[in-house]
Swiss-Prot record:
Gene Ontology biological process: translation
Species of provenance: Rhodospirillum rubrum (strain ATCC 11170 / ATH 1.1.1 / DSM 467 / LMG 4362 / NCIMB 8255 / S1)
InterPro entries for this protein: Ribosomal_bS16, Ribosomal_bS16_CS, Ribosomal_bS16_dom_sf
Entry protein name: Small ribosomal subunit protein bS16
Keyword Mitochondrion on entry: no
Extent of Low complexity compositional bias: 115-124
Taxonomic lineage from the root: Bacteria, Pseudomonadati, Pseudomonadota, Alphaproteobacteria, Rhodospirillales
């Protein structure tokens, strides 16, 4: 049985509320789960203390047994200090600005440099 620590959605329409649960990876998202480990309320502000609530000892136990956290839960665990924060991959070549955009950026930098040099020479 492959275990996952993941979010199970609750709450009303347009008012999400999530339970952080340990469940078999084959069970439905909001279906049967083994244990409730905490809650996540995305409607609260990011810095609110009740936005993510976790049972630390139980999370450590399930991680020790081999349960894998989902991406979102792994982020919560990293922020709470229970696991190492996942590393964000560097920008890929495909995500970088295209050639024309890079050329425009270079031209803008050169103009800014020239203006700064002109201002410096005018003062001195």
């Amino acid at each position: 049985m492959s275990l996952r620590i993941r979010l199970a959605r609750g709450g009303a329409k347009k008012r999400p509320f999530y339970r952080i649960v340990v469940a078999d990876s084959r069970s439905p998202r909001d279906g049967r789960f083994i244990e409730k480990l905490g809650t996540f309320d995305p409607m609260l502000p990011r810095d609110h203390e009740r936005r993510v609530v976790l049972k630390d000892e139980r999370v450590k136990y399930w991680l020790g047994v081999g349960a894998l956290p989902s991406d979102r839960v792994a982020r919560f665990l990293g922020l709470s200090g229970l696991t190492e924060a996942r590393k964000v991959p560097e920008q890929t070549k495909q995500a970088q600005p295209k050639a024309k955009a890079q050329e425009r950026l270079r031209e803008a930098e050169e103009k800014a440099r020239a203006a700064a040099e002109a201002a410096a020479s005018a003062e001195g």
